[in-house]
Amino acid sequence: MHNKPQMFHPQAEAALANPELRANFRGAMDYLRDKRQTAFADPDEENAIRDRAEAIRQRCLSKLPALLEQLEANCIANGIRVHWAENAEQANALFADIIQSHGGTLAVKGKSMVSEEIELNHAMAKEGIECLESDMGEYIVQLGDETPSHIIMPAIHKNKQQVADLFAEHVPGFKHTLDVDTLIETGRNVLREKFRSADIGVSGVNFAVAETGTLCLVENEGNGRMCTTVPEVHIAVTGIEKVVEFLADVPPLFSALTRSATGQSITTYFNMISSPRKGDELDGPKEVHLVLLDNGRSQAFMDEEMRKTLQCIRCGACMNHCPVYTRIGGHAYGTVYPGPIGKIISPHLMGLEATQELPTASSLCGACGEVCPVRIPIPELLQRLRREAKQDPRPGVPALRGQGAAKSNTEAFIWRSFGLLTSKPALYRMMSWCVTRLRGLMPSKLGPWTRCRTAPRPAARTLRELMAERNK
């Protein structure tokens, strides 16, 4: 199932009409919110962690071009081969070239949202290369031919009955059961067999340290470590914004990430990769490649306000607290990155023409901004994108691809008329008087808003009339 952002409204309606999906999400979201609240029990500590994480991300982004050059130089000095990709097509071509140069036919992949962004699995399949997900949630999603519905818990929309049905359909010899331990063991056994025969290991990167040329990988299942040590060749892929300046920047960001994502003080595994296998080492890959992807990030970087989207450390906390996402899930958005953060990232990746409906799918309640560990002002950025979807590019301001795509001459005329009306007191009083006298002619239905709400009706008298009567 591969949805499209242009179909957001019908996809959202379908999700709302699915009671099983809503029940799955409700339980998962409640659990994750409670875990985060427990992890940040002390408000003063929470604010201190968020302040420090925000400061680190802003400092690193302010030096991004220089840090990327430093990262490249230190990675090369360590023996890591660095590749640059402007877009998804270039990234996939690099992957294909590296894998085919080693005669590879099977790649095992750790969790990586950037690989989802470039649709790596499908691109490699066209080249005759099997790309198998090794994260349990990603593996379940892959079996169902779906995309992840959450950036840290890809199969959060599935319950154990649905997982068991998938295993019964796709895993030979599986005896249908709802026992969670048996389901996990089944997936683990399949994946371990694949690890033994894999030619290539693929992973994402949580933090890339410019100071030391180190790639940091956060995980809980151990599959990331297997992907980066068992195969002879390891390919890491990440967005250019993931670079940090110093090794000392990692622990504060790591603490903010784990507490915000899963409510953990620390994850089960934390991997630091600084080179291929050395002569005196017994394990690890013989080659390590790093693919640095732009794919619209430079455009966001050029805009001082939209640059804040690049602060994201992919924790998913904004999704867990969003009243829209928690009711419709991730697939309704039709984008790789769903929820609040997806609504401000996706326009840079796909253009406003394709994603114009997403910034409007928010109540602007501010919950996302209140829990963001790096204090991205998501509500303010959503309002900016709403304006840009309706307005033509302005001189001197970097324009998003597709800016003005949602512009409507009729809507523009209505707002210009409203502006004129409210700027002329005499005209406004006359129109208010007319509306109150004609209130009985108001239609009972006003589009989708009134499907489950009573249509608002003008008052019988204007405020000016009420105040005049009161002051008699």
Feature-to-residue mapping (PLM):
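The feature marks the mature, well-folded catalytic cores of soluble enzymes
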Residues: M1-E305
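A glycine-rich phosphate-binding loop feature that marks nucleotide/adenosyl-phosphate handling sites
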Residues: Q90, T267-D280, R314, Y325-G329, ...
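Short coil/turn segments at secondary-structure boundaries
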Residues: G137, S265-Y269, V397-L400, F413, ...
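Gly/Ser/Thr-rich active-site loops/lids in small-molecule metabolic enzymes
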Residues: G224-V243, Q311-R314, I341-K343, H348, ...
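Ferredoxin-type iron-sulfur electron-transfer modules in oxidoreductases and energy-metabolism complexes
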Residues: D280-T309, Y325-P443
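Short linear elements at protein peripheries
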Residues: W433-K472
